[in-house]
Amino acid sequence: MSFSSVPTLRGVQEVLSVSNDVAAELAGVGDGVLDSLRDRLGCTLLLRGNRLTIEGDEPHVSEARAVVGELVDLVESGHEIGPGTVDTVFGALEQSEDVRRVLDDVVWRHRGKAIAPKTVTQKRYVDAIRSSTVTFGIGPAGTGKTYLAMALAVASLSDREVGRIILTRPAVEAGERLGFLPGDMLAKVDPYLRPLFDALYDMLDPDKLTTYMERGTIEVAPLAFMRGRTLNDSFIILDEAQNTSPEQMQMFLTRLGFGSKVVVTGDVTQIDLPREQASGLIQVRDILGSTEGLSFVSFTNQDVVRHKLVQRIVEAY
């Protein structure tokens, strides 16, 4: 791959000729990839046929050359790209990370869908979960903390590295307590646990998930149900951990048994506890930050992988 360069009144113009297949990927559906590039780069990009023209001042053109070069390499190595890939490439280049090392780490596949890190921080998070007994993923909504942890849990179960998966959340959010909610226990906890079920349905066939649930191979339950237990040979995920008290956090972490792995996720900007109640997720880093076998991974709004508007909302708040 090589660019031809010509000086212009605006600075420099570079032209890259690519195959028709690569050109189609660089455009994207509805020009989505090209529009993402234009949004991120301070120069003009024009794709006509199989020729991509970049024009602007030298620093911006140089940045565009690097980003486009990475995208072309990804396409030629068999990757499908989209607007999100543009963000991944920018993040990797900014942090001197190998783009393929991030995108090629497929955590789980289901029905042809590959679940893999999309940002450098997500890749570090995946690596931390694999190498540590207890991992904390802390950051805004939409950064893939829980989803990636669940994909790793399903993969570990499939590979027989663990015998069961346990998913839990505090059942106290937005001022609601179980005792004051209508209905039986299942009806009471369902609204709190539904997001975890939604993710599981993305990763497993419904029949297999039902079988796992009936056998207790996968358990989804409120945090209160963990008290008094020792959880061996398990992959345990505590979601929405910002809504635990310090006492609940200690109780949960001491459930860890032999052959188990724990992931704790949460967003300390979305605490629903009473104002006078301390968050266990905020305190735990000060208490356990230097403890061997534990990892802490912090996400930022740059790691939000949902709709672009979600990232803007996170930034605004």
Q: Where are the regions that the model predicts?
A:
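Accessory nucleic-acid engagement/destabilization modules that flank
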Residues: 1-4
